[in-house]
Regions:
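A short beta-loop-alpha structural element at the N-terminal edge
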Residues: 1-15
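Conserved GNAT-fold acetyl-CoA-binding loop/helix
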Residues: 14, 18-44
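A short helix-loop-beta-strand connector motif used in the catalytic cores of GNAT acetyltransferases and
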Residues: 41-56, 73-77, 94
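Conserved beta-hairpin
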Residues: 51-68
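Conserved acyl-donor/pantetheine-binding loop and adjacent beta-alpha core of acyl/acetyltransferases
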Residues: 69-97, 105
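Conserved acetyl-CoA-binding loop-helix of GNAT-fold acetyltransferases
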Residues: 100, 106-119, 142
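Conserved active-site alpha-helix within GNAT-family acetyltransferase domains
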Residues: 111, 123, 135-143
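Conserved GNAT acetyl-CoA-binding A-motif
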Residues: 114, 121-133
Length: 143
């Protein structure tokens, strides 16, 4: 199930951030470009929660396996990009900081989060979806 996050979800979300960074350290593959202690952190999640744009994926028992910041905010650099599908800001939905617990990788959970975001964007009248990730993030770019 994918739903808006609550304050009770914050420790699990922060633990997933740390698990991803631990996984990157263990494998030597630093694909996210994230910096431990700088981004993302518990405070990052708190800010996104306060904005009302933090979503979580959970098992039937409520165990959090992933999160994302889903909104319509774009980095200023996006205005300079050469997009395959040009769009006005009002037409665009954006996924930021998509996370899946590394222990749950390969189960199609990120695709579930993206499908949820696409459906939500359509319901909001958005015509374009953008994924805020770096070009070096091969894992996310593969999605």
């Amino acid at each position: 199930m994918i739903r808006l996050a609550s304050e009770q979800d914050l420790p699990a979300i922060a633990a997933i951030y740390e698990a991803i960074l631990d996984h990157e350290d263990a494998t030597g593959l630093h694909y996210t470009g994230w910096q431990r202690g700088a981004y993302p952190t518990l405070d990052t999640a708190k800010g996104i929660l306060a904005a009302g744009t933090l979503y979580v994926g959970t098992d039937e028992d409520g165990m959090v396996w992933g999160s994302m910041n889903f909104n319509d905010w774009q980095l200023p650099e996006y205005a300079k990009g050469r997009w395959t599908i040009p769009a006005e800001d009002s037409e665009v939905a954006v996924i930021h900081t998509l996370t899946i617990d590394p222990k749950r990788a390969g189960q199609g959970l990120a695709r579930q989060m993206i499908a949820f975001a696409e459906d939500s964007a359509r319901k909001q009248g958005k015509t374009v979806m953008r994924f805020d990730t770096g070009t070096e993030n091969e894992v996310s770019n593969h999605l």
